[in-house]
């Protein structure tokens, strides 16, 4: 499905006409605990905590012979049963599955637009240290059980990784003015 220039200009007009809420700035003195941080309440300390950890993304495509629907269903419903406790055991702060279908990627294809990243999904991990992530990858349970399960739905030859830090500018419709990391 292609997005026409008309729809793009309509989206721009709609965004311009929408009233933007005033940003709030709250001073953070004490770091918040994970129990105090939730996606429905803006707390600067929660944002600062997230900016201090490593954010790793693994992009990959589905195994040949399975549909996007089969890939997404298996990953969301089966693989999480195998991998969930494993991630908790290593102290992963957050694990998120990013599901992308060909139809969703087609929505990005516009004349003159940037090339679309052709991956069916990405697993995202927020970990306290790189050693945490490396230990996960070398753990026998990962090698023997999780990798075997991934073979049911992932084309391992397509896998690509990136690591970095989040630098959050807007959180829950609030401008973020205090950061857990600085870039100089």
Task: Please give the residue ranges for each predicted region.
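Fungal secretory targeting signals
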Residues: 1-22
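Macromolecular interaction modules
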Residues: 18-184
